[in-house]
Amino acid sequence: MRGDIMNIEQVATNFTYEQLASALYLKGELDGFPKVTDKTKWREPVMADKLGHIAHEKISAGAGKDEYGSDAFDPSKEKYAEYKSQAIVEKQLNNLFERSRGKRNYVPLKVTGVYNGAYKQEALDAYKDVDHYFGVFYKEQCVLVINPNTDEVMRQLEYNNANRKEGKTTNLNTVTIDLKDEMLYTVAYKNEEFYIDNIEE
């Protein structure tokens, strides 16, 4: 992995933002994902690869389609999957690893998934029938993916919907999973090498 990091650092040094973004865009086209640089779409094939899923080519499927309310297909379960992701910064690694801070440890990380448009009954109904996966990215490297219980995801979405004030945005319906609440999720993927390299820092 350290050799990979050195190679990535060399690429980052030698190429401009525009060149790197263009390369990512072209990589998406070659792999069948048009406009992969839109709305962190590129994270979806990354998560799908970690989970053994097949990511949808388009950013979102329209209402009425089987894949509506999902980002990928899980062939092992023959079920659709919805992906959410968040980027964390260095200080949040303290929470991810629950590192020591004197006599106590840092509180566990809270992982969030933002559901835009999840204030429509049609969208809420679609989310009931798919699996949900929340990815955690550090420096755009996928370090953890959790699979929250669908019942808990729906409980929070429906609660937020019921308490939305009139006229407020129908976007940003946020589900939060505290990693200390292990009964609410399972770990679907963990970058073990990243954990070994960073957990004690």
For each predicted feature, which ranges?
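Nucleic-acid endonuclease domains
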Residues: 2-79, 83-201
